[in-house]
A protein has these predicted regions:
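Acceptor-substrate binding/catalytic loop of class I
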Residues: 168-185
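Conserved class I S-adenosyl-L-methionine
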Residues: 1-43, 148-170, 221-222
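A conserved beta-strand element that flanks and buttresses the S-adenosyl-L-methionine
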Residues: 119
Length: 264
C-alpha cells in the first residue's frame, strides 16, 4: 500500500472502534464527546450525507439513526476501516441507502447528486491542504448544504506541547507529518474557500499524555470541567456553510430537512 495514511490506518480499526466504547479514560470521553457534538451540529440537516473519512463508522451510524438521511456515501482511504464501517452500518441502518467508496478524499467525485451534509472529522490532521480540500468539499454541497469540520487547535498550550514533543516520533511512526491548525488558520482557509463559520463547538481539556499518566483521573477531569473545555478546549468542531448562508439562523432547517418534514 503506497499511501502512508492508508497504510497507517490499516492497523487501527479495532483500536479506533474501542475509543467509542464507553470507559473511564480521556480518549473514550473525547470520542464520545466528538460524536455528541457532531450530532448536535447536524441537527438541522437531512437528505444526502457524505462522510469523507468515516473511519469505523460510529459517528456516521449515530447520525443515520436519526432517520433524517435517505442516502449516505461513506468514504475512507483505508480498506480495513471502510470494511469495519460497512459491517456496522449494514447491520444497524435499515432505512438509508448506503454507498461505500474506498478513495482519497481529494480524488473522490460523487456519482451524480450533491450532498446536504458533509462530515470531515478526524481528517485534516492527516491530509492538510485546506486550501484544496475546502473548495473541493464546497463543490459537492447541495443548495443549503453544510460541512462539519473537526480539528485539534494549536491555540491550546497542551496541543503545542504535544506537537513539540512528538512531531519527530510521529513522522517516523506514520511516515507522514501531522498537520496542525490554529483558529486563525481555519478561519482564513474558510474565507479563502468562500465558506462561513456558522457555529463552533470546543471540547477536550487536552491534558498532555493524560491517559498515559492516569486514565481514570483524566476521565474525571474531562467530565467535571466540560464547561471550561467548551470555551477553551483543545478540539474545535465547526459548522460551515457557503458565505451566502452564513448569516442564517444557526439552527435554521435546511431545504432537504424541510422536504423531509413535509412528508411526515
Amino acid at each position: 500500500m503506497n499511501d502512508p495514511v492508508a497504510a497507517y490506518f490499516e492497523k487501527l480499526p479495532q483500536i479506533h472502534k474501542a475509543q467509542f466504547v464507553q470507559s473511564t479514560s480521556g480518549a473514550s470521553f473525547y470520542f464520545q464527546k466528538r460524536l455528541k457534538l457532531a450530532c448536535e451540529l447536524a441537527g438541522a440537516s437531512a437528505g444526502r450525507l457524505l462522510d469523507c473519512a468515516a473511519g469505523t463508522g460510529e459517528i456516521t451510524c449515530a447520525l443515520l439513526k436519526s432517520g433524517r438521511f435517505s442516502h449516505a456515501t461513506v468514504v475512507d482511504i483505508s480498506p480495513a476501516m471502510l470494511q469495519s464501517a460497512n459491517e456496522l452500518l449494514s447491520a444497524q441502518i435499515t432505512n438509508t441507502a448506503l454507498e461505500f467508496v474506498r478513495s482519497d478524499v481529494f480524488n473522490f467525485k460523487p456519482s451524480g447528486s450533491s450532498f446536504d451534509l458533509i462530515l470531515c472529522l478526524g481528517l485534516i490532521a492527516h491530509v492538510g491542504r485546506l486550501d484544496i480540500l475546502l473548495p473541493h468539499l464546497k463543490s459537492m454541497l447541495a443548495p443549503g448544504g453544510r460541512i462539519i469540520l473537526q480539528t485539534t487547535l494549536t491555540d491550546h498550550a497542551g496541543v503545542r506541547l504535544v506537537r513539540a514533543l512528538t512531531a519527530r516520533r510521529e513522522l517516523a511512526q506514520r511516515g507522514y507529518r501531522i498537520s496542525w491548525f490554529s483558529q486563525r488558520d481555519i478561519a482564513d482557509a474558510c474565507n479563502g474557500a468562500g465558506l462561513g463559520i456558522v457555529e463552533t463547538r470546543r471540547h477536550s481539556l487536552g491534558i498532555p499524555f493524560g491517559d498515559r499518566l492516569w486514565p481514570w483521573a483524566n476521565f474525571q477531569l474531562e467530565t467535571r470541567l466540560q464547561k471550561w473545555a467548551s470555551r477553551h478546549g483543545a478540539d474545535g468542531i465547526y459548522l460551515l456553510a457557503p458565505n451566502c448562508q452564513e448569516r442564517e439562523t444557526p439552527n435554521a432547517v435546511t431545504p432537504a430537512a424541510q422536504r423531509l418534514r413535509a412528508t411526515m
